[in-house]
Amino acid sequence: MDSSLVNSGLQARLGIRPHCAGIFIAAWTLLAAGCPAQSAETPFESSLAPKAAGRIDELVFAKLDRLTIQPANLCSDAVFVRRAYLDVIGTVPTGQEASEFILSQNANKRRALIDHLLEREEFADYWAMKWGDLLRVKAEFPINLWPNAAQAYHRWIRDSIRGNKPFDQFARELLTSSGSNFRVPPVNFYRAIQNREPEGIAQTVALTFMGVRAEKWPAEKLTGLAAFFATVGAKSTSEWKEEIIFFDPKKPNARSFTPVFPTGITAKLSVDQDPREVFADWLIDPKNPWFARNIANRVWSWLLERGIIHEPDDIRADNPPSNPELLACLEYELITAKHDLKHLYRLILNSQTYQLACVPRGDKPEAAANFASYPLRRLDAEVLIDALNRLTGTTEKYTSAIPEPYTFIPEEVRAIELPDGSITSSFLEMFGRAARDTGLESERNNRPTAAQALHLLNSSHLQRKLEQSRMVRTLTQSKDISPEVINGFYLTVLSRFPTDQERKIVASQLQGQGYKNREAAVDLTWALLNSAEFLYRH
């Protein structure tokens, strides 16, 4: 079939301006449908086969070998720098950051980059956003924390992450704190639970800290766990929307049920002892079968799309791990590191398993569950709009459905920094931002939709950003479309140097239209921002 007919048909279906079609097709086909070109070495992979660099790799590769699945090659440096920035700090690298990393001759540059990113301020911003989903940090309906409580809660979460607070301490403070929801931020863990009956609290605790959906448990097992939270009291104060969370041993029916740990062992409590503290001590004990397993599995899923137990918040006996030895290894590492989550991040990020290319070496159905290649996944809504704003030099307006004095957000604030799930935008809603109503991982939806594609292809929202773009100004103000200008453009948008073919296409399109033709520059930027390579983690 004549390729010109195929291309013209594609233009018609997508509404692509004809003079931009060559650029768009070149950009789109690089990673279209998650299938990069299968050449010996592409922009997405190196020519190097992986070799086990530690215990994680030994366990993953041994399982793949038993399944006769060949792992992907290692990813290229260009892919790694973009992947690491997105996965660790939820931010795309600048063109200069990408260029310096790619050109560096330091044999340990990947390890050095990981260490650097784990100490960046954006690490706390991004992971506070992720924990905000799980802990339901939301001011308005149906969580109703109220704006100043939501912001205090978010600040405490962010400060805990920034200070690398041990995860067992983080969990214990959430479970045992008492006081004002405005002045003792972790008590908002209880305030953010919709069903504040003991059974409702128990289900949320099990989901958050054990990765278990306790509503599926036998009634007597759930009742035993709920008894630990039967004395959680709440009372209002004279300050509007302030609430005090406290241990209330006189609460009606507080001692009607006997607290029983999920292991089936009955707890021994004194009359004046807060059962929450007894449960928290049991939960974070290194011998506990759920606590370390839950967070180790979640961290793995956050970095590699799926848990070793999948889904990561549905741990149960009939949902076994795909690699039990691997999960046990991560649990052991976390416990011996005294629940230092950065230690866990560092181990996973430095593994060859994490650094595999997104280009699979086969099509066996078991490959994905056993981590034979890096999974393709669309950027989080917040990460995507921040990337668009950064690349175009524009800002975004975020508002709450019920405006309050506390919810004014300056336009320069990035989406990953938003402290409250009630503060949003139509873009964030369209692109699947978590509702923060249940704490389930599935609330966040990164699956692409037709509405999203149409928005990126045809919306005035993106068009306005492109018209104001610094990149467009650079392309139109350059006296000559030199290789350096094209290199800088690709490094800024895709965090890599263009291939020779891409450089020729871009040069011909711009020179063919006149290199000062603003519309051609806008179209070029638009084409790359609509490419799967830009929109997906890879």
Q: Which role does the model predict for each range below?
A:
Residues M1-R17:
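N-terminal secretory signal peptides that target proteins for export/translocation
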Residues G34-S39:
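Boundary at the C-terminal end of the N-terminal hydrophobic targeting segment
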Residues S495:
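Conserved micro-motifs of the catalytic ATP-binding
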Residues E41-I265, E277, W290-E331, H339-T476, ...:
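Short, structured secondary-structure elements
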Residues L269:
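Penicillin-binding protein/beta-lactamase superfamily catalytic region
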Residues C20-A33:
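Bacterial N-terminal signal peptides
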